[in-house]
Amino acid sequence: MTATTASSAKPYLQIQGLVKKFGDNYAVDNIDLNIYQNEIFALLGSSGSGKSTLLRMLAGMESPNQGKIILDGQDITKLAPYDRPINTMFQSYALFPHMTVEQNIAFGLKQDKMPKGEIDARVEEMLRLVQMTKFAKRKPHQLSGGQQQRIALARSLAKRPKILLLDEPLGALDKKLRQQTQLELVNTLEQVGVTCIMVTHDQEEAMTMATRIAIMSDGQLQQVGTPSDVYDYPNSRFTAEFIGETNIFDGVVIENHADYAVIECEGLENHVRIDHGLGGPSEQDLWVSIRPEDIDLYKEKPEYLGDYNWAKGTVKEIAYLGSFAIYHIKLANGRVVKSQVPAPYWYVRNIITPPTWDETVYISWPENQPTPLFR
């Protein structure tokens, strides 16, 4: 489901004013959220943000202090977990070690007293879906981590839930396998057409898999949007710093026009100019966020640089990360700015020797890249 489709559709899951307290502490603080059918929706936040507590309330494992959970028009707030058309796949997978793969998948169906012929057909269907048919007779300990993840997914989908909850679904896998499995999991969920809500602290996982992301902190929603929205258009300093890397400058608006604005930033000798006007008057305080990948790096000062959007500094650190490098540039006032340079960057510019430690360099950025963040 695209963001455009979601915005015009009727919400499939409605979370209305949900609150959960432990003592005097709000684990979830008045959450309102609409999730649409066939979405893969990510709850993203650091430890203690409230994302897992929210997931547990959706599953029925925690009872809210107030608020409602409406699924497909039905109020399920007070339903027991086993009465909800919701299944959860945990990070540990929770496979029964004494059962075979096919027995694990069939377990929930047997609990529901489904006829044996239908169980066998459903198990076979799930095994084909996750491409694990030839492993049907194996026990969990005879499978790799990635294979166990597939079986846990198949078992979760076997009952055809209206909502599938994923609790750190790939957290038990190593990084390389996790990256490979992300797209496999998305493909499987899209084939089935199930609405999915996943909890993760892994930004890359959320950005890769989710249709939309809700960023949580201190039990509250900080921003909800598509992966590109929350990365390119953060609505607060918290979101800008939480998603990816960024350079944050304290600033004050000194010019504000219909089609551009000029901001004086602490630590930058030259002002920052952006290609659009800002709401509100001049002289308002704000922050300016500039992503490292949006900052160009030069050994010599380009002739076209004018009065805005550039600075001079010294290379203090270089982190080589294969396909790109992160340069830490120390400015005259001691402020350090990060610039992310792709591997072919210097080759394209016919520069044989890239800048190195303690070398003077120049950085610049286009007018459309700085993001103003109001206080």
Predicted regions: what is each one?
Residues 40, 81-241:
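ABC ATPase nucleotide-binding domains
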Residues 65-68, 118, 218, 250:
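Conserved coupling/switch loops of ABC nucleotide-binding domains, chiefly the family-specific signature
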Residues 67-75:
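Conserved ABC transporter NBD signature motif
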Residues 44-46:
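The feature captures the beta-strand-to-loop junction immediately N-terminal to the Walker
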Residues 59:
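Helix-to-loop junction immediately C-terminal to a conserved catalytic motif
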